[in-house]
Regions:
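C-terminal accessory/tail domains of diverse enzymes
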Residues: 1-31, 76-77, 146, 186, ...
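DNA replication initiation on ssDNA origins
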Residues: 1-85, 163, 171, 190
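Conserved short beta-strand edge segments in small beta-sheet-based binding/regulatory domains
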Residues: 56-62, 150-159
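Secondary-structure capping and boundary motifs in well-ordered enzyme cores
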Residues: 76-80, 106, 114-115
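Modules that initiate DNA replication and primer synthesis
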Residues: 84-85, 89-100, 104-106, 118-147, ...
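A common structural junction motif
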Residues: 106-109, 146-156
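Short beta-strand
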Residues: 111-118, 155-160
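Polar, glycine-rich mid-to-C-terminal structural blocks
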Residues: 176-202
């Protein structure tokens, strides 16, 4: 199998990286992991020889200039500076080997569906970037992504805004022989308002507040007296 990046992927990146400054590829083998950082306007080339021996991922959401852009740093939530999509993953093993078919039943329909070799990654593209200038904005969009994932029934482990996902055209070396990552559905003009997607979600849970707390330092007799008065 000859891996080759699907050229449509770069059109997707143009949408996903709006409002950001940096991004990175994340490459791994059985013995090493490394990041390849670059400006969002100039994605780094990926040699075919690399694709033949490494799993390749990319940062779904763009990152700010404050991110640690060293070769061994993989971006985290605090590095994200804008969000242009909500995502969810569905594993083939959970859908009788046909997560692609399940993705076709989702409402609202995903804008893009990419088969990773073991399941599908679904993207609901936003019409405008959600900018992340501070912690409250970051906390809000991170919460929406987690709640969206629960609402749509996606895999529990794929619900963070710093997610890296597989690049279409690359190979998935978790399997032998390796499986190619492919695009299953492609609708870059299928855009959603974040407010409309958020309106589909159940209300965020409200943390319950308990009654008066009993100090741990109270004597046993004091605790007994308190219990008798209850």
């Amino acid at each position: 199998m000859n891996p080759e990046i699907d050229v449509r992927f770069y059109d997707l990146l143009t949408h996903l990286w709006r409002g950001g400054q940096y991004a990175h590829w994340w490459a791994k083998t059985s013995t090493s992991k490394q990041s390849m950082w670059f400006a969002t306007s100039q994605p780094a080339d990926i040699a075919v020889s690399w694709l033949k021996q490494m799993d390749f991922y990319y940062t779904v959401n763009p990152l700010g200039s404050h991110a640690d852009r060293s070769v061994h740093h993989k971006s985290g939530n605090d590095d994200v500076i804008a969000v242009n999509t909500l995502i969810a993953e569905f594993d083939d093993k959970d859908y009788a080997g046909n997560a692609t078919g399940h993705a076709q039943t989702l409402t609202p329909a995903p804008s893009v569906v990419i088969h990773s070799g073991g399941g599908v990654h679904c993207y609901w593209l936003l019409d405008t970037p959600y900018l992340v200038p501070d912690r409250p904005a970051r906390a809000r969009i991170a919460d929406i992504e987690k709640r969206w994932n629960t609402y749509i029934g996606g895999s529990v482990g794929v619900n963070d805004i710093a997610r890296v996902l597989r690049i279409p055209g690359s190979l998935n070396f978790k399997y032998s022989p390796a499986r190619q990552v492919t695009i299953c559905a492609w609708h870059l003009d299928r855009l959603y308002r974040l407010a409309d997607l958020e309106a589909l979600l159940p209300p965020a849970p409200v943390l319950a507040t308990g009654g008066p707390r009993v100090p741990n330092s109270m004597a046993d007799q004091d605790l007994l007296d308190l219990a008798r008065k209850a």
